[in-house]
């Protein structure tokens, strides 16, 4: 399924309406309450086999003016537990879409942080 179709599906399923995934080149990005969200991937290396076995996703968040916001500070903006769950699902979806989009460059498994 093309990235744009997946994004449309997830945006339709977002009943809260305060978040939006969107295509950005060959990857996905998201807006959530004034923050622009994107994914960074760090390789996970098996030292015995001397090869990359996967990637760990990290959230990159910026305010509208471009000021970086740490991931913990981004989560701290959530007012309650339900908002944390929604934001966490948005971030994991964003990371999964971006990992799929780069699968021809990076294989292995995807490690996701969960809050």
Regions found by a protein language model. Give the residues of each.
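Cyclic-dinucleotide signaling modules
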Residues: 1-7
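Active-site core of bacterial EAL-family cyclic-dinucleotide phosphodiesterase domains
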Residues: 13-76
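Flexible, charged surface loops at secondary-structure boundaries
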Residues: 32, 79, 103-105
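N-terminal accessory/assembly segment that mediates macromolecular interactions
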Residues: 76-77, 85
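Conserved nucleotide-sugar donor-binding catalytic segment
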Residues: 82
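Catalytic core of bacterial c-di-GMP phosphodiesterases, primarily the EAL and HD-GYP domains
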Residues: 85-115
